Amino acid sequence: MSCCGGNCGCGAGCKCSGGCGGCKMYPELSYTENTAAETLILGVAPPKTTYLEGAGEEAAAENGGCKCGPDCKCNPCNCK
């Protein structure tokens, strides 16, 4: 398999592919934290949760993508 800068190419469904689409492929788009005043409003209502059968796998790949390990095998889908 091909790796790009130590990052494997992660395809759909959290499966590694041969491309260079690994985590942090575009460093200029990486997460940065801005310092700003924030207000947190706490409520007493229970959190709203919705579970759709079969949607968990796609949501993990869509929201986080894959984190590829050094041996070009996908680790848990938790790259953000």
Swiss-Prot record:
One of its GO terms (molecular function) is metal ion binding. Transmembrane segments: none annotated. Signal peptide: none annotated. Keywords: Metal-binding, Metal-thiolate cluster. Pfam families: Metallothio_2. Belongs to the metallothionein superfamily. Type 15 family. Metallothioneins have a high content of cysteine residues that bind various heavy metals. This is Metallothionein-like protein 1. The gene is METAL1.
